[in-house]
Curated annotation (Swiss-Prot):
Catalytic activity: aldehydo-D-ribose 5-phosphate = D-ribulose 5-phosphate
Catalytic residue positions: E103
Protein name as it appears in the record: Ribose-5-phosphate isomerase A
InterPro entries assigned to the protein according to its UniProt record, in alphabetical order: NagB/RpiA_transferase-like, Ribose5P_isomerase_typA_subgr, Ribose5P_isomerase_type_A
Keyword set, alphabetical order: Isomerase
Chain's gene name: rpiA
A Pfam family that the UniProt record links to this protein: Rib_5-P_isom_A
Pathway stated in the Swiss-Prot or TrEMBL entry: Carbohydrate degradation; pentose phosphate pathway; D-ribose 5-phosphate from D-ribulose 5-phosphate (non-oxidative stage): step 1/1
Family recorded in the similarity comment: Belongs to the ribose 5-phosphate isomerase family.
Keyword Ribosomal protein: no
Function per UniProt: Catalyzes the reversible conversion of ribose-5-phosphate to ribulose 5-phosphate.
């Protein structure tokens, strides 16, 4: 089974967490694209979706799934999204696709976070994948200096502007032993919008595509 086939299996497995007549929170990325394809098969049974990125919004609209503004929605029963890394405590690094802030906002609203990944994303310790930090453009150099003080090697992701008009610093060489603490420390730096650690709001359910099929883990 190829990596993409494992992603597809995880994406389709998430359908069982979608409630009838609900509005579904939808994340961003290659695994989520498979979930969107799956969601389109039951679009008549749901009210619609809230999206965490322009890319996912366009894909859903093209498939005929109604997309709502989060401000017009009182609650989301479920949010389905991928991860760049996830540990055994359901803490994640996300934001490889630069949609981390909107992903974090939608995740905060949702009652349940279902994370869908292939088995290459499971790790014991977070940090091998560079940690994305979304930054107000004028604060980029200052934030980079502060991130160095925290032990990281920040690299400006050139040519990338987020959906919110900000820039991304990817922080390398972090061995993240206490994800919640580091998430709070980075978010406390003036000029940081948010960072890609999802530890304060981790996943509730993890669906992992493996060569043997989809494995389910719960927090």
């Amino acid at each position: 089974m190829t990596q993409d086939e494992m992603k597809k299996a995880a994406g389709w497995a998430a359908l069982k967490y979608v409630e009838k007549d609900s509005i579904v929170g939808v994340g961003t990325g290659s695994t989520v694209n498979h979930f969107i394809d799956a969601l389109a098969t039951m679009k008549a049974d749901i009210e619609g979706a809230v999206s965490s990125s322009e890319a996912s919004t366009q894909k859903m609209k093209a498939l005929g799934i109604p997309v709502y503004d989060l401000n017009s929605v009182d609650k989301l029963s479920v949010y389905v999204d991928g991860a760049d890394e996830i540990n055994g405590h359901m803490d994640m690094i996300k934001g490889g696709g630069a949609a981390l802030t909107r992903e974090k906002i939608v995740a905060a609203v949702a009652e349940k976070f279902v994370c869908i990944v292939d088995n290459t994303k499971q790790v014991d310790i977070l940090g091998k994948f560079p940690l994305p930090v979304e930054v107000i453009p004028m604060a980029r150099s200052y934030v980079a200096r502060e991130l160095v003080k925290l032990g990281g090697d920040p690299v400006y992701r050139e040519g990338v502007v987020t959906d919110n008009g900000n820039v991304i610093l990817d922080v390398y060489n972090l061995k993240i032993i206490n994800p919640k603490e580091l998430e709070e420390k980075i978010n406390a730096i003036v000029g940081v919008v948010t960072n890609g650690l999802f530890a304060k709001r981790g996943a509730d359910v993890l669906l992992v595509g493996t060569p043997e099929g989809v494995k389910t883990f719960t927090a």
